[in-house]
Amino acid sequence: MIIEARKGNTQPALSWFAQKSTLSNNQIADWLQIALWAGQDKQVITVYNRYRHQQLPARGYAAVAVAYRNLQQWQNSLTLWQKALSLEPQNKDYQRGQILTLADAGHYDTALFKLKQLKSGAPDKANLLAEAYIYKLTGRYQDELRAMTESLPENASKQQYPTEYVLALRNNQLAAAIDDANLTPDIRADIHAELVRLSFMPTRSENERYAIADRALAQYAALEILWHDNPDRTAQYQRIQVDHLGALLTRDRYRDVISHYQRLKKTGQIIPPWALYWVASAYLKDQQPKKAQSIMTELFYNKETIATDLSDEELADLFYSHLESENYPGALTVTKHTINTSPPFLRLMGTPTSIPNDTWLQGHSFLSTVAKYSNDLPQAEITTRELAYNAPGNQGLRIDYASVLQARGWPRAAENELKKAEVIEPRNINLEVEQAWTALTLQEWQQAAVLTHDVVEREPQDPGVVRLKRAVDVHNLAELRIAGSTGIDAEGPDSGKHDVDLTTIVYSPPLNDNWRGFAGFGYADGQFSEGKGIVRDWLAGVEWRSRNIWLEAEYAERFFNHEHKPGARLSGWYDFNDNWRIGSQLERLSHRVPLRAMKNGVTGNSAQAYVRWYQNERRKYGVSWAFTDFSDSNQRHEVSIEGQERIWSSPYLIVDFLPNLYYEQNTEHDTPYYNPIKMFDIVPAFEASHLLWRSYENSWEQIFSAGVGASWQKHYGTDVVTQLGYGQRISWNDVIDAGATLRWEKRPYDGDREHNLYVEFDMTFRF
């Protein structure tokens, strides 16, 4: 069977090994080697993991090292090469395997140094080929061509040129030295496949990878014309069709990958697993996560168990295909698998040192991401903080930590962490993207624009960059705001029956970064015993937004009772830090004056001040004071305390407790509008937000609310207040956010319990 396997007939031997329950160490090594000859890299690793605690011959470890290298798991490959060399330190093939893997991992200087030591023994064609390979990876194409030329046999004809030599000539712009017509179809297909493979090398820069992929695409275009209708080139034509998927993926042409894949499926062409992974990656990047999840589940799961030989990139794509499909159990399964199968550190054979295991770090990064998207931000913060501070030199971990701080509503804390990360690699794309998001939150518009412009120029197709650019583009749009309410069945004395309250405002795009102009219209009406009250407002103003500061000044013409009067408003707030904010508002012809008062010719001016304390997304409180000076000599003082305590959170449900206290005092008593001498409300409530559907920036949720409390009014005693509410809210494509809520309330007015049934609505639209 071994002899047959060497001839290419590997299946009988593989079947025999699979049926045996007991194997010697040499037989295990045979199994590993034959599986490698069969091109079953993942099977090699599966078998090795089953017998990893046995002392295998060096050839067994070497086979596993090659399999790991084929799967681009460089560190695992290097560990196995070290094991093989510890048993056979003079084996030149093993030394070359280690050297080539070092080059793949980006350790070019170490690889060249070890190769120089190996070459010092005696000239060897294989060493020259290894040298050319390293120079090709480093971009030293002249040295690559020199080494390849030295490796050629004397008097080699063009038809005998190896694929690597042809590539070396092309890398040095010497393609004219090659007569493509004299190259065999297999060599031309090999060249195309090699270009695609090189375009995926993670140690190359993005520009290098794009340039290589462009060469592969150009070569595909030429070969496609030659072989499309040539029945003698069917095998080679099918090869380049599959490899074409990889070149398109490297160039971030995700929709082209998908359409090409669909064309191949229609022709009945078999797509190998590694090419299906390219397709799944394209679906994921094109925001079609469920299709990506379907393909990856078929590729990477054995029944319900995740394969043990996945690369870090494959694990990440599988994880995000679950997460972005809202499949949290699946994402958690990948997370647990990654953590449970990966030790924190890897020890290099033959050395006392150990190095951090990137896969273990990735697993804990998954853990924090699942917590973040499951609305468990405290756990996400704990995980990312521990990782960031235990690995201070890891920039990515600190960026992840800053992202969680930003999600918790602490942009200044996030900004500080990003400053620390900046020391390591100031122009890292992910760093600048996160800095731009923080700048947007802090209203540092110019800084956000500069950072966004830089990353868009460098990595325009990066998904994080695309998302950031979209946010900045939306910020620069005009904005329409509509808000109001309408009564359905009301008995309350303030707003009247079948009341309507509507405000529509249009904001201009940002002017000189910080300014926006706005104009709008307001309308309110209600039916009272003394007649119908109507108020119309025409308003215009300016808004200022900068770091820590928001200001808005408004002038309004208010029409009521067949006359019009000028009104004005000045509002603003200031943030001291991530936790504390103070704000105030001054208003002439205030909107705090009830509609019924204005129906009876009573107006008023008001002043308001408030303090807000924000701990995090799970707890916040605010205290406000308002004073209204009515034109009928009444003076009203109002004090309120409002808060939020999160008592439950899960991926689809959030429940908050909303304590609320309100105190009001008036100096005049006999007025045509509701005007208690003193009143005090305590009405705690609960609000539940249930996510019905979400896809990236689009979501649909429903909100339930209920509250029961008490209201005390001087001379009328205490009575019960009850509140119920149900609403829905839609967010769409970053430009629409709209909601409507049906509310019912029953409360005492001057000793009589009366009810109000009404609808509140609001919409923000960017255009």
Regions found by a protein language model. Name each.
Residues 8, 14-17, 24-26, 30-32, ...:
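Gram-negative and organellar
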Residues 2:
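Negatively charged
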